[in-house]
Amino acid sequence: LTSIGPLLPTLRQATGLSFGGAALLTALPVLMMGLMALAGGAINRLFSERSAVALSLLAIGLGALWRELAPGSVQLLMSAVLGGLGIGVIQAVMPGIIKHHFLNSMALVAGLWSAALMGGGGLGAAITPWLMSIGHDWHSALAWWALPALVALLAWWPVSRGLSRLSAVGENRGPSLLRNRRAWLLGAYFGLINGGYTTK
């Protein structure tokens, strides 16, 4: 997600991407993340924890790899949709995984997860220009980010055997989040954070 920003001038020059297209390139992943957050309940019912994380990592990896083969702006935009879909799914299911498997250390693990998200975003913005500076073209500099996603997928699949369905955790759903004041406050808080983060 953050690897695109530093290369936008190069991308626009190489692909003829308009200013509107450049805005879409950064907005589409965020839109997909929001849609997947709304679909979190359905995702949790349809997929096991193991499958949901694996599919999300696969989508992120393929989205990044697609950029190696993207000759123009349309394919670049589609890769952004696929990557955003993967990020959105993993962000929708990870809180349930943390709650289910790390109940006694939930705050620590959730903090580590949040730090990893922010740190990974910073690395994407910092390392991608460096990859271009050592001789890679923009295609390759962006496609390199398929590697950590696919490594994570290969690591996740064997260690996650036996994980149960997320829906088993959430059978007692309690009151609707739409009537929960704290849920609205948290939504506004994280929305403002992500809004500021993605408009820099």
Predicted regions: what is each one?
Residues L35-V74:
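Conserved MFS/SLC helix-loop-helix module at the cytosolic interface between two early adjacent transmembrane helices
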Residues S79-A115:
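Cytoplasmic helix-loop-helix junction between adjacent transmembrane helices
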